[in-house]
Amino acid sequence: MLRIPLFVVVSALPLFGFSSEPMVSVRSELRDGSIYVETEATIAATFETIWEALTDYDRLSNFIPGMKSSRLLRYEGSTAFVEQKGSAKFLFFELPIEVVVRSIEDRPHSIRIELDEGTLERLSGGYQLRNAGRENLWNLSWSGYIEPSIPIPNFLTERLIRNDLRAQFEGMVIEIQRRTEAIFTRDRESVK
């Protein structure tokens, strides 16, 4: 099997329509009182780089917009219990969020997220990771349900959650790209 070095893949991305700005697709709809959101992006990175960013629980607030803190409380088997605090904003409205989530890691395919406790009525979903047909090219997606515990008009809720999830997902993709570029730079300098 032909193995193409990661720096070659990263260097060629502009030729294939990929840029340093994340190309994120987002779809949302109201379902059974909750907002269902799907986000997806194609990322040129190693599996390890992607997985390390997704599971860097203590540093998520450094690169996820709207997240003020994220702290790994403990692991129980392959389940990480993570405390997160932040807010979702849309126009003049701000929804404070404080949750403890269970991140159920099914390496290498997915991380399922379930609400353990907090200020949301419902949070269930997760990340899916699939190879995009080439070495070091991946489809990363997040899909799930979110329902605030306070009553908010549906037209505001859907926009609030969709915009917030887009920003958070883009933050994750940008961090993966940043880590990939750091590896590429380090590898390139070690060859000199």
Identify the residue ranges that each predicted region occupies.
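Bacterial N-terminal signal peptides that target proteins for export
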Residues: 1-6
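Hydrophobic h-region of N-terminal signal peptides that target proteins for export
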Residues: 10-17
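Hydrophobic ligand-binding cavity/cleft-lining segments
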Residues: 17-77, 192
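One face of beta-strands
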Residues: 22, 35-41, 84-86, 97-99, ...
